[in-house]
A protein has these predicted regions:
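Hydrophobic helix-and-loop "lid/oligomerization" segment in the mid-to-C-terminal part
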Residues: 1-39, 49-63
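Secreted, periplasmic, or luminal enzymes acting at the cell surface/secretory milieu
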Residues: 42, 51-189
Length: 189
């Protein structure tokens, strides 16, 4: 028997995550600690499923989980997919397409992605493709606002794992990290 605990974050095009979404909330961390303690005391395992689109803080709690699975917002079939992986019906064979930093601010791109503005889209319109333009005429066009209307990419060649590898920065999970249930060997002939 195992406990499967799922944590999620919502974001998408035009609705990036807030800076504080990188961190686990106090109640999420408390839940991980409580479930881990209870299951380990009974000789059972805890699997944490991350239903996310970009990294969250894992360094402080990953030792409490026996496995961490990144689902990366898989949609309505997530339950079936995770069940198939955890029961060994399918081989997960996934590798991380990004680096999980130890803390927010460790990656140079963090400075360019703060969702620090008020999102005004009506909740009923999310995902509908409906365009809500005001009928009000502006006398002067609005100046584009950084991190709302555009984003500067200032990392140069040090995008993603290149920064962490080049500067030897400690990470929680490196780019390409991942396991599968398959055993294999590489051989050069």
């Amino acid at each position: 028997d195992i406990a499967v605990l799922t944590l999620g974050r919502v974001s998408g095009e035009g609705c990036d995550r807030r800076v504080e979404d990188f961190l686990l909330k106090e109640n999420e961390l408390a839940l991980i600690k409580q479930v881990s303690a209870a299951y380990r005391a009974a000789g059972k395992k805890l699997v944490v499923v991350l239903n996310i689109c970009s990294p969250v803080e894992t360094a402080s709690w990953k030792g409490l989980a026996d496995a961490v699975v990144c689902a990366f917002q898989p949609g309505q079939e997530v339950g079936n997919c995770i069940t198939d992986i955890l029961t060994g019906k399918v081989n997960p064979s996934g590798k991380l397409p990004m680096t999980f930093a130890v803390k927010y601010g460790d990656a140079p791109s963090d400075a360019n992605f703060p969702f620090d503005y008020e999102f005004k889209m009506p909740s009923f319109a999310m995902g509908t493709g409906m365009n809500f333009k005001s009928e009000k005429k502006e006398e002067k066009p609005k100046e584009p606002e950084k991190n709302v209307d555009f984003t500067n990419y200032e990392e140069g060649i040090y995008v993603g794992y290149r920064y962490f590898d080049t500067f030897g920065k400690e990470v929680s999970y490196p780019f390409g990290h991942g396991l599968s249930y398959t055993a294999f060997d590489y051989a050069v002939e």
